[in-house]
Every structure is written in structure tokens, then in C-alpha cells.
């Protein structure tokens, strides 16, 4: 949401420049150099947010309705859906309010708009942080279920999962308020970037280790049944492809946004960096796309959840 003044807010006003006519083309930056700028139409931005909102509401509803899904794993998946819901909802609200203000359909005092902007920024930042945390929590949960299968139910209990969820939400809100309050400090932006890289490394290490264990297990079964080596290789290739897609989507959807934050610290006035800054709305749209993809990867693959979802949809009609 636009804020008066030359300073940029961490989330709300990094995109404070009014949206130009939607296009994909070359725009001139302040030095006259040509750079690629991708403008996201407001309608597309709102549509992506709405799809994500509906998807994640369905996931939360299905998990809440079915007591069989009240397990630690689904607790993390439900909270991931709630985080993605808030990411999409807060960005939709910000876009809608901005459009109404620009069109003159909504009259509000500057102080009220500023307070609303602060609230939306905190919600957006905290939901982004919690979303990354819950992606990491799901990876840790799956890792424990594979490498400590016999002790899993004693290690990952529902009370512990609830305490972890509460800690993640509280930490996300507190740190987001801190980040918003000190948005103009380079250390704040670097902390966010380091946090993203830490989550990326954590997920990569855990999932690669899980893939290696799965390949060893498949190789053992193949030897037991005296199968040919290509069958094991096929399993390994399939697992590697799945892992590449999972981590690739995570990096492609979240990476540009954190690259944006990194460049704000490293080269805020450089012409090339200025070109990248013009695509902030595209980076936010990619995060919303990730919120659309998350339910497909982590939730809708569950047969029990899909069955509950069908019941919810049939009852709603």
C-alpha cells in the first residue's frame, strides 16, 4: 500500500510506486538504461489470491472436520495452509484497498490508511515467516517418521506439535513487528535472507537424506527379489525428479523475493538492481503461486483428506 515519503517499508511500500499499465516489455530506469519490467495486472493478482484463498480454506476446513486428520503431521499442514491463506488474503486486501483509494471510491484519513498499512504489513510478514517455518517443520516431521519410525509416535506427539505451532506463530508475529519497525536497517533485511537460506538448506539436506534412504530401501528389496538393477535406477530417478520439483518450486517462488531484499542492501542505487526492483509485484505474485501449489504438494495427495474434502463440498451444496 502506498505510503507518503521517500522511505520504503519492508513489505507494504517496497511496491509503493503506482502500478503501470500491465505489460511485459523494456522500461527505462533512472539512468536511461533499458530493463525488463513485468507488470502484474491487478485482476490477475486478485485472481491468484482468490484461488489460493479458496484452496487453503478447503484444506483447513477438511482437517478441522475429520478427527482422523488431527495428527501432528496434519497439524503442520493445516498451519501451513493457514499461513498461505493469510499471505494471499493480506495481499488481496492491500491490493483491493489501494485500488479503491486510487479510484476515489474509499475515503480515509492518512492516519487511518497508515495504521491499516501497518496491520497488513505485520500480517503479511508474519504469515510469510510462519509459512517458511511450517515448510521446515513438515520436512523435519517426515524425516523423523522415516529415520525414527519405531519411536516416531513418542517423539512427535500432538502436545509437542501444538507447542511447536504456538512457538512458530508467536515468534513469527514478534519478529515481523521487529522487522517492520526497523525496516530501514540493512541487518533486518539480511536476517530475513539468512532465514530463507537456512530453511532452504534444511529442507534440501533432509529431503536428500530421505531420498538416499528410500533408494537404499528399494535396492534392498530389489536384491531380495533378485530384480534387475534398472528397476532400482528408475526408482532413484523418479525420487530425484520429485525432490527437484519440490525444492525447485520452493526456490523459484520464494527466491526472487529474497533476492530483491538482498539487492536492496547490496546495490540500492545500481541501475541493474533498480531494474529488478521494478518487478516487486511479480515476486509477490510468485509467493502467492507457491501458496496455490503448497496444498497440491502437501495436502491434496492424502486420500483421507480428499475424501473429507468431497464430503465438505457435497454438504455445502
Curated annotation (Swiss-Prot):
Its main location: membrane. GO terms for biological process: adenylate cyclase-activating G protein-coupled receptor signaling pathway. InterPro entries: GPCR_Rhodpsn (IPR000276), GPCR_Rhodpsn_7TM (IPR017452), Melcrt_ACTH_rcpt (IPR001671), MSH_rcpt (IPR000761). Glycans are attached at residue 29. A lipid is attached at residue 315 (S-palmitoyl cysteine). Signal peptide: none annotated. It is a multi-pass membrane protein. GO terms for cellular component: plasma membrane. Keywords: Cell membrane, G-protein coupled receptor, Glycoprotein, Lipoprotein, Membrane, Palmitate, Receptor, Transducer, Transmembrane, Transmembrane helix. Belongs to the G-protein coupled receptor 1 family. Interacts with MGRN1, but does not undergo MGRN1-mediated ubiquitination; this interaction competes with GNAS-binding and thus inhibits agonist-induced cAMP production. Interacts with OPN3; the interaction results in a decrease in MC1R-mediated cAMP signaling and ultimately a decrease in melanin production in melanocytes. Receptor for MSH (alpha, beta and gamma) and ACTH. The activity of this receptor is mediated by G proteins which activate adenylate cyclase. Mediates melanogenesis, the production of eumelanin (black/brown) and phaeomelanin (red/yellow), via regulation of cAMP signaling in melanocytes. This is Melanocyte-stimulating hormone receptor. It comes from Miopithecus talapoin.
